Amino acid sequence: MRRDLYQARITDDSVETYLKTFGAVCIEGPKWCGKTWTSAYHSRSEFYLADPTGNFQNRKLAELDPSLVLEGEAPRLLDEWQEVPSLWDAVRFAVDLSKEKGRFILTGSATPNQKGILHSGAGRIARLRMRPMSLFESGKSSGKVSLKGICSGSLESQLTGEVQLSDLIDYIIRGGWPNNQDLPLEQAALLPKEYISAILNDDIERIDGVKRDRHKMELLLRSLARNEATTVSNKKLKDDIKDIDHEDIVVETVATYLDILNRLFLIDNQKPYGAELRSTIRVKQAEKRHLADPSLACALLNASPEMLKNDLNTLGFLFEALCERDLKIYAESFGASLYHYQDYRNREMDAVIVTPEGEWCGIEIKLGANQIDEAAQNLLKIKEEILAENKGKEPKSLCVVCGLGNAAYQREDGVFVVPLTALGV
């Protein structure tokens, strides 16, 4: 590969750290998010399982004798290893024998059936999740404001520049796909649509050889798009399909198909948080639903820029999804985790970031600057309720991430305000 053409990714540091720590690293994530490019950058030799040359001779060789494809300068890239699941055990065994660090990099766009893998690889093969590009990685955010700094309670007030609504809509429809960043928006919108087609026409059967109902899977994907950034249950998805598409799908099928989409890394849900914040008030445990990139929801909804301008409710959910995609990428780069918060008093925080030290930061996400006051008051109210508990833990900071803002600053009530287009690691 042309290393001088490589576009740096936030996960690069983690890849280097993992290679120094483990015998092998498995980089997982949705197709087309840049896994192969990043892995090739960090490797010294490569083997591509999906190469069609010679009627897929690479895959046939790996199936014949997995150990043969492991020979090469380290780190050696085994791209799309799930095409031959037995490679996992071959890598684990090779790592066990040599005890050397950084021998292999595996990439995977799907998780094969566990029955095809004899050992977990724990302690030998470390898993690293990769996602589409954040706005900072694609150059759409200046990165002047550090999320790590916010989570430690510090923010330097500064002007960040004007942002147009049309820009935010562009970022949502375009998505974080590396090959999409320099295309005109009309062309860029085609990639996530093609992604969905590839999933439906090939991947849902190829993952384990089981034939599935393509139409029902498409209905489920459309329902997930309509319910992006919400905490609806599987039954609500079933009911949504019945109400909108007038078709019946049993809940068990919904659950089975969601598992397939999860194994294809098409789903990237946000876990609930709350048990560590308070002791007596009941906290909801539903995950917030997300597709791997908000552009996929746009593709499934056939959402054009004009449609989103005229449907600010849908745009609001998609902007929230955009923010939470980026927050997860930034947070994981310094060992933090992204959650969301809902309790049975109907109090919500769009995002909660928990640092490795156990500190937490509450975040509200708002598209318009006119919503900042309400969002800040909501955060302060939740903080007040949490601290009223005997074991309530004070947040390190509270923050409103907004779309249409031109400055990062701290309000008189202590709440930070940061435009998404200024946020970075």
Q: Across the structure, where does each feature detected by a protein language model lie?
A:
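N-terminal pre-Walker A segment at the start of P-loop NTPase domains
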Residues: 1-16
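Conserved lysine of the Walker
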Residues: 35
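Hydrophobic positions on the alpha1 helix immediately C-terminal to the Walker A/P-loop
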Residues: 38
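Short glycine-rich substrate-engagement loop in P-loop NTPases that contacts/grips substrate
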Residues: 46-75
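Conserved catalytic/switch belt of AAA+ P-loop NTPases
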Residues: 88-110
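Interdomain motor-coupling "hinge/lid" segment immediately C-terminal to the ATP-binding subdomain
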Residues: 115-230
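Accessory nucleic acid-recognition modules appended to NTPase machines
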Residues: 185-359
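Domain-level recognition of nuclease-like catalytic cores that cleave nucleotide substrates
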Residues: 403-425
